[in-house]
């Protein structure tokens, strides 16, 4: 069984990637295969609502999305991770959500998978962003793993999130719950 985490930060090796790796370590400890996929530097354009994906499982936009969609489709668990940018999810994670959601949604291809969000904020916007990602999991039929608090940690400068002890514990427990649910549903 495999869990993938798609990190929507445009920065590699930043706070969101650190928090996501922390969560993936908790999942791997439970015997699952894990993979972090960073969207930093990837060419993923926004959806143009052409609806080709409603007819067949493809997208006519020629960029880096479809191989990532295939990895998501093959995984039993998917985590979406994003920093808060201007009170919301980043544009690249949103483009992934829109397009992968449309491609998968028509035939409920993600239904029954395990999922959940991870959010990193400086000081605000985290609740809306967390909900924004949760709605994606909800509408696509995921079983969502919870934790001991919202799956949120705080930090702005690179490495600051490592000081958020409660955020790290929450992310760790979230990872354990992702693994538990995945084994129960797909084991």
Name every feature range the model reports, one short phrase each.
Residues 1, 29, 67, 138-187:
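Glycine-rich phosphate/pyrophosphate-binding loop and the adjoining helix
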Residues 32-42:
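A short beta-strand-loop structural module common to alpha/beta enzyme folds
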Residues 2-32:
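N-terminal beta1-alpha1 ligand-phosphate binding loop
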